[in-house]
């Protein structure tokens, strides 16, 4: 058995005295593992850092075998990732989520979002939005997707402002207003792809929304808690948004 595909490195663990077991995410083959001979050498250590983009060739005698990897560097993101704490935390969170999916099960859209994330990891505002979208898609891949297409109560397509915590379906402003304290807020960037998050409240509402359904459908059934890295990441995003807002205010004052 053999395949060759571009991949994003997720992590490694020691295998014998000189080798490692490498874990990557690919578009067509999903999360995959294999042995890299000599992977503990200094030269290979640079290549095998999480976040690096490689051309991966995997082969084994039988499909069920662990197999071997041969790698070629395409884009070594890891050296720059350390400059952006939000990106490091976000990658750790994405890897945490991916570990909840079956190995060798393709999830091309999740791969595409991860790839886009790695292309823009130095843009924290873009990454915050991408991570919310990743968690939304992750829920869908597990069969717990939210229905944000129309109001669950009226069928309306406009002014969708809430999500029912019971059904996971959108609710319009008119129908949801009397029950707004019991509903989850729906940020507009999840409804309209042309809309970008206005401020941190949009991002925070996005994480609250995905976190609620992740807890119900994914974490609690597996007896696991919300990952601490997710909590830290949301706090980092909030700090970054506040710094940006202060910078914008200062520029406005200087023009007066």
Curated annotation (Swiss-Prot):
Pfam families: RecO_C, RecO_N. GO terms for biological process: DNA recombination; double-strand break repair. Keywords: DNA damage, DNA recombination, DNA repair. One of its GO terms (cellular component) is bacterial nucleoid. The keyword DNA damage applies. It comes from the Bacteria. InterPro entries: ARFGAP/RecO, DNA_rep/recomb_RecO_N, NA-bd_OB-fold, RecO, RecO_C. The keyword Electron transport does not apply. NCBIfam families: reco. Involved in DNA repair and RecF pathway recombination. Belongs to the RecO family. This is DNA repair protein RecO. The lineage of its organism: Bacteria, Pseudomonadati, Pseudomonadota, Alphaproteobacteria, Hyphomicrobiales. The gene is recO.
